[in-house]
């Protein structure tokens, strides 16, 4: 049975609009990942945006719980139901139906569609929710309905805001299988399994804790697909269901070991973690040192360590991508499109970690010998800092030994490292925004962007806000303006904001806050709420931005055409004088590839294709072949831009014809993170300036080289440098005088020119037995080097002794060592002491 489809079809038949799963990276700064089905609708529940039409929605939402407040990572593999990635089935009502229908729908689906036995079902309600208790009695005997308090049956989004009682449906897995002391309704055992939570959002909690009834209560429900699939298939663990067993069987085949549930935690960890890795990578998250990318790295490295326990010594996770795509690509079709790119990124990250995992485990095992209860925080930090072991990976390894890590010491060292990094950081552009945008929305609704058609207009000032986003009636200082109709494009989709003027006040920036388009203005003449003002954008700047933005679309198309369909946009920045485009690709681009891409973009520009803009429903746009971006949130109708062969969803401003772009030049190609590359480029006037600068640079090079043929001039210069280096090297050989003691040639000397390492090598090659120590001063920096050949001394000890006299330190091998010093006044003393040490040893 396809439970996912059955659920969505059922609620569609109840007049719910099916909403596609939102991105795992939410449009919510407070969340690391989308971790519940209601997250995409949060701003509707809180009243920040108006209720949708229709007011009923249903979805199967992909979710991640690994990192942040909701973090199940440590438990995955050791329990029957914890996952880093899961799918949440949900139905939602925004001020439409309430408890009676929500309960009736849930009961109908569970008993008539899933056909779960009624005698296995139990219900919980809030202890004060008599309404829900009575409604449930229409479907089930009251002896099967249990009342619990706030801890179990009251839901709230935060300390303030919408909240309400909830009701849960439980499934009895059978007394014959579960009979511990905790296996009762309300206990911590596994016999009674919660399968569906119905939240009745009927109150608003104020800052002082008072609950006030909402005028239009709402419904938010959630049912885990993995859990209900296991129940429907008669399995006691989600991992034994058809969603996971094909992956586990593939792991078993790859490692040539049989999966046994009791000892199979490593199989389960890998099966879970490959699902989350595939989905995160498919949606544009890349392996990184921080943020979401670091959570992804932790997930994969935890799986690799468990693979190591199963005997995998080479990359193997990438081989599991196919089975995940086979299982889930039918519903999430983008997985198949990204499959090759996902494999490459996983393989690259695997090989990177596998090169250090063995050394890291050796260090872990050495420290384990000295550990009684608490593992050293210093060693845990070393494992993290040097060998790439996330703390939770070390903790996971210790868990198997019933030990813990000194997290306090680890965090102390981590904070010290962060402080050092912060000290070298120049600052941040981050700013906390705390304005009453909900009030503005209620008063005025969303204001209108008219900038697609107009560069200037007369418009009413709806609201004025100071720099701290507090509403004011008049404004002379710098602050924010909300116009009824605005020609100013707000920073969005990588495109930078317009600038210009409102009245005589200069507009420096325009941003969107909860779909309100607000412009930031410099201090100047007084503006008043309710008056009409003339708004005018900087049309020349807009035109240059549009040219660069259209070029990113052509670049994206060229990249996919030349490198492959695995390429997808991972970020962009569009300004009036440059563009930056990040994209998924597993390796640096060759000179030939860059030349082909640049040439292809210029061909599309020369083709003079008209820009075609269309508005259509999202699903229709996708069917037409338009490319949508995962990190963008699309609602209702979408704007589709066709530029020649390129077709993408985009809300930005663009040229009317590709010929207006002028010409396109790639300035730089670089890596952003594992699996993500970046191209920086220029078009139009910026391209002309780039070419002009290149030509000026070549002209200056000709003048400096005194040669019109630059390549010939550079070659000649390189030959001269090589000749001078050889002369210097040869001259250094003749500068060293020495004496012989007991058949050993000795040289202790200060030399301020030449390569002292080369001098020492030459000296040692010249004699059968030799000891040499040289001190060199350059730019008041002291360098020492010593060499020993077939003599009873160690170069490391010799150079260390001399360096300490000079206020420095150093060391090295027995035959060669280097050091540094600080005190120039003690060079003679150091030379004298070194000579005495050598003579004594001989």
From Swiss-Prot:
Its cofactor is Zn(2+). Binds 1 zinc ion per subunit. GO terms for cellular component: cytosol. It comes from the Bacteria. Its main location: cytoplasm. Keywords: Aminoacyl-tRNA synthetase, ATP-binding, Cytoplasm, Ligase, Metal-binding, Nucleotide-binding, Protein biosynthesis, RNA-binding, tRNA-binding, Zinc. It is an enzyme of class 6 (ligase). It is found in: Cytoplasm. Transmembrane segments: none annotated. GO terms for molecular function: alanine-tRNA ligase activity; aminoacyl-tRNA deacylase activity; ATP binding; tRNA binding; zinc ion binding. Its EC number is 6.1.1.7. GO terms for biological process: alanyl-tRNA aminoacylation; negative regulation of DNA-templated transcription. SUPFAM superfamilies: Class II aaRS and biotin synthetases (SSF55681), Putative anticodon-binding domain of alanyl-tRNA synthetase (AlaRS) (SSF101353), ThrRS/AlaRS common domain (SSF55186), Translation proteins (SSF50447). Pfam families: DHHA1, tRNA-synt_2c, tRNA_SAD. Zn(2+) binds at residues 549, 553, 650, 654. Coiled coil: none annotated. It catalyses: tRNA(Ala) + L-alanine + ATP = L-alanyl-tRNA(Ala) + AMP + diphosphate. PANTHER family: ALANINE--TRNA LIGASE, CYTOPLASMIC (PTHR11777:SF9), ALANYL-TRNA SYNTHETASE (PTHR11777). NCBIfam families: alaS (TIGR00344). Belongs to the class-II aminoacyl-tRNA synthetase family. Catalyzes the attachment of alanine to tRNA(Ala) in a two-step reaction: alanine is first activated by ATP to form Ala-AMP and then transferred to the acceptor end of tRNA(Ala). Also edits incorrectly charged Ser-tRNA(Ala) and Gly-tRNA(Ala) via its editing domain. Consists of three domains; the N-terminal catalytic domain, the editing domain and the C-terminal C-Ala domain. The editing domain removes incorrectly charged amino acids, while the C-Ala domain, along with tRNA(Ala), serves as a bridge to cooperatively bring together the editing and aminoacylation centers thus stimulating deacylation of misacylated tRNAs. This is Alanine--tRNA ligase. It comes from Campylobacter jejuni subsp. doylei (strain ATCC BAA-1458 / RM4099 / 269.97). The gene is alaS.
């Amino acid at each position: 049975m396809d439970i996912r489809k059955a659920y969505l079809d059922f609620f569609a038949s109840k007049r719910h609009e099916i909403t596609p799963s939102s991105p795992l990276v939410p449009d919510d700064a407070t969340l690391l990942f989308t971790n519940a089905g209601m997250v995409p609708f949060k701003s509707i529940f809180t009243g920040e945006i108006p209720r949708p039409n229709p007011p009923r929605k249903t979805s199967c939402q992909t979710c991640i719980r690994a990192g942040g407040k909701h973090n199940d990572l440590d438990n995955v593999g050791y329990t029957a139901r914890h996952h880093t990635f899961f799918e949440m089935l949900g139905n939602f009502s925004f001020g439409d139906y309430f408890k009676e229908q929500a309960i009736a729908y849930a009961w109908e689906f569970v008993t008539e569609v899933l056909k779960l036995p009624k005698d296995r079902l139990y219900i919980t309600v809030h202890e004060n929710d008599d309404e829900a208790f009575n409604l449930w009695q229409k479907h089930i005997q009251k002896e099967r309905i249990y009342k619990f308090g706030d801890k179990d049956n009251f839901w709230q989004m935060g300390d303030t805001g919408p909240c309400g009682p909830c009701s849960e449906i439980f499934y009895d897995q059978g007394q014959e299988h579960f009979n511990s002391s905790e296996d009762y309704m309300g206990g911590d055992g596994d016999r009674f399994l919660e399968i569906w939570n119905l939240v009745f959002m009927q109150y608003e909690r104020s800052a002082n804790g008072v609950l006030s009834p909402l005028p239009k209560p709402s419904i938010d429900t959630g049912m885990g697909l993995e859990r209900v699939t296991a129940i429907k298939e008669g399995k006691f663990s989600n991992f034994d269901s058809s969603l996971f067993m094909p992956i586990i069987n593939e792991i078993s085949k790859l490692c040539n070991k049989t999966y046994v549930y009791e000892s199979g935690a490593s199989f389960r960890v890998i099966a879970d973690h490959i699902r989350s890795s595939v989905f995160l990578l498919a949606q544009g998250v890349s392996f990184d040192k921080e943020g979401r990318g670091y959570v992804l790295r932790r997930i994969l490295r935890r799986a690799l360590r468990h693979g190591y326990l199963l005997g995998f010594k080479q990359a193997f996770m990438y081989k599991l991508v196919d089975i995940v795509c086979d299982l889930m690509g039918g519903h999430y079709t983008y997985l198949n499109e990204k499959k090759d790119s996902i494999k490459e990124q996983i393989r690259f990250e695997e090989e990177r970690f596998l090169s250090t995992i063995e050394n890291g485990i050796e260090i872990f095992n050495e420290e384990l010998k000295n550990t009684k209860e608490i593992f050293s925080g210093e060693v845990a930090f070393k494992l993290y800092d040097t060998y790439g072991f996330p703390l939770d990976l070390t903790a996971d390894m210790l868990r198997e030994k019933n030990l813990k890590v000194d997290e306090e010491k680890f965090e102390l060292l981590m904070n010290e490292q962060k402080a050092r990094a912060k000290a070298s950081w120049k600052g941040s552009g981050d700013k906390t925004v705390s304005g009453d945008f909900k009030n503005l929305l209620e008063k005025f609704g969303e204001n209108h962007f008219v900038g697609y058609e107009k560069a200037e207009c007369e418009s009413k000032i709806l609201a004025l806000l100071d720099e701290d986003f507090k509403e004011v009636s008049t404004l002379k200082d710098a602050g924010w303006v909300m116009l009824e109709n605005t020609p100013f494009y707000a920073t969005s989709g990588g495109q930078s904001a317009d600038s210009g003027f409102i009245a005589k006040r200069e507009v420096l920036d325009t941003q969107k806050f909860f779909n309100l388009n607000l412009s930031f203005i410099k201090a100047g003449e007084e503006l008043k709420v309710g008056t009409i003002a003339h708004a005018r954008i900087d049309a020349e700047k807009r035109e240059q931005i549009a040219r660069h933005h259209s070029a990113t679309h052509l670049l994206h198309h060229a990249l996919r055409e030349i490198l492959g369909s695995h390429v997808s946009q991972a970020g962009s920045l569009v300004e009036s004088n440059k563009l930056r485009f990040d994209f998924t690709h597993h390796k640096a681009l060759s000179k030939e590839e860059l030349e082909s891409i640049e040439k292809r973009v210029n061909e599309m520009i020369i083709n003079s294709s008209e820009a075609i803009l269309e508005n259509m429903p999202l699903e229709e746009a996708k069917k037409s072949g338009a490319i949508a971006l995962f990190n963008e949130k699309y609602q209702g109708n979408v704007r589709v831009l066709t530029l020649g062969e390129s077709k993408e969803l985009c809300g930005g401003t663009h040229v009317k014809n590709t010929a207006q772009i002028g010409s396109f030049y790639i300035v730089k190609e670089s890596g952003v993170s594992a699996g993500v590359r970046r191209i920086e480029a220029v078009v139009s006037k910026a391209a002309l300036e780039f070419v002009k600068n290149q030509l000026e640079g070549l002209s200056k090079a000709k003048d400096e080289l005194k040669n019109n043929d630059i390549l010939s001039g550079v070659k000649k210069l390189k030959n001269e440098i090589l000749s001078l280096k050889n002369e210097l090297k040869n001259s250094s050989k003749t500068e060293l005088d020495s004496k012989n003691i007991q058949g050993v040639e000795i040289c202790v000397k200060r030399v301020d020119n030449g390569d002292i390492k080369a001098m020492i090598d030459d000296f040692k090659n010249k004699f059968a037995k030799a000891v040499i120590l040289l001190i060199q001063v350059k730019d008041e920096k002291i360098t020492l080097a010593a060499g020993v050949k077939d003599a009873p001394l160690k170069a490391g000890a010799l150079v260390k002794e001399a360096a300490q006299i000079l206020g420095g330190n150093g060391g090295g091998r027995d035959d060669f060592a280097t050091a540094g010093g600080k005190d120039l006044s003690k060079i003679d003393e150091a030379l004298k002491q070194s000579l005495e040490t050598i003579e004594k040893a001989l």
